């Protein structure tokens, strides 16, 4: 009886190691994005089309820009630098995800023209504000790296939207027989 029980701990340890490795290598997209609130994550999950998701990410990016403007308008608050860095990173994440969804929508030949046009209209506004912040010099020195990343992400999103508009042909026009 004791002889049969000895392999059990070895089998159990092997199983637990395999389960741990499987859990560690599970896809990252199944996890909640750390820069989205629970309500925002829920909206993304509930969106039925890629176009709606892109528009949501653009609106979340706009919200982060608005919060950045507020933070710079009220300089004396506690933990301000931390919040600003978090907002800049969250903005870059939203823009990156919106841009990634545009590329995915084009690859899958989905109807995302409205979302592409929204990205093309809103992203230049975001870029102008970020460049204005970057030009402030010493007052934004501690945010410079994150700000540069956000500017790069916005430039990439603008470029991706322009490329996607060229690649994403409009749907065929249905004509009535005469």
Predicted feature locations:
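Long, charged/polar, soluble alpha-helical segments
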Residues: 29-178
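Bacterial N-terminal signal peptides that target proteins for export
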Residues: 2-18
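C-terminal segment of classical bacterial N-terminal signal peptides
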Residues: 18-27
């Amino acid at each position: 009886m004791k002889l049969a029980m000895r392999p059990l701990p070895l089998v159990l340890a092997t199983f637990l190691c395999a389960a741990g490795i499987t859990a560690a290598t599970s896809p990252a997209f199944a996890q909640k994005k750390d820069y989205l609130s629970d309500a925002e994550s829920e909206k993304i999950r509930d969106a039925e089309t890629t176009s709606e998701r892109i528009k949501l990410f653009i609106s979340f990016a706009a919200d982060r820009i608005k919060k950045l403007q507020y933070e710079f308008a009220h300089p004396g608050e506690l933990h301000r630098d931390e919040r600003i860095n978090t907002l800049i990173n969250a903005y870059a994440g939203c823009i990156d995800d919106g841009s990634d969804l545009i590329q995915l929508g084009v690859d899958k030949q989905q109807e995302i023209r409205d979302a592409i046009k929204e990205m093309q209209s809103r992203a230049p506004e975001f870029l102008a504000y970020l460049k204005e912040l970057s030009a402030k010099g010493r007052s934004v020195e501690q945010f410079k790296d994150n700000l540069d990343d956000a500017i790069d992400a916005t430039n990439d999103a603008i470029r991706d939207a322009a490329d996607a508009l060229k690649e994403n042909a409009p749907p065929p026009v249905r004509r009535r027989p005469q």
